[in-house]
């Protein structure tokens, strides 16, 4: 068995590690008939009778981190989190919610003054309240709700090298 980037993207699988990081990176897709569009728009569309020809990853990333929690090493993720920094702007994608990944930004500007443990915790708690989560066979909504701020906080601290 093997997975491909194109298959993961076109399938829009909620458990896709690849889709989560590409969403955080702000990737775009090119489809033979529909043309170029943001990956986030493609994931929300119902396009099924087309051909994915390219995945376009924009330049300018100054840092990125991906974290996930799995019940065991070979499982699909219970929850996935990718954080990308461009200049001083952060973009967070949360995947395996169990729905397809969705991106979030620092709407309240909590990260504008730099990352400390306290700021990372405050942002993680605030963001986790905005994330729509659900349950499935891998885990409950409650377990994902408890895990989300942990992954976001750890990701921010790792990205910025804060110990």
Predicted regions and their residues:
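C-terminal structural segment of proteins
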Residues: 1-163
């Amino acid at each position: 068995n093997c997975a491909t980037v194109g298959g993961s993207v076109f399938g829009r699988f909620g458990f896709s590690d690849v889709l989560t990081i590409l969403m955080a990176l702000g990737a775009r897709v090119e489809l033979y008939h529909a043309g170029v569009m943001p990956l986030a728009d493609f994931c929300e569309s119902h396009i099924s009778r087309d051909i994915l020809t390219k995945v376009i990853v924009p330049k300018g990333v100054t840092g990125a981190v991906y974290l996930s929690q799995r019940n065991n090493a070979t499982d699909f993720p219970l929850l996935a989190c990718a954080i990308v920094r461009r200049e001083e702007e952060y973009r967070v994608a949360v995947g395996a919610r169990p729905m397809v990944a969705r991106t979030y930004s620092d709407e309240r500007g909590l990260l504008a003054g730099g990352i400390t443990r306290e700021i990372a915790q405050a942002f993680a708690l605030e963001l986790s309240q905005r994330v729509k989560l659900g349950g499935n066979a891998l885990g409950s909504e409650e377990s994902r709700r408890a895990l989300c701020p942990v992954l976001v906080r750890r990701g921010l601290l790792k990205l910025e090298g804060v110990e």
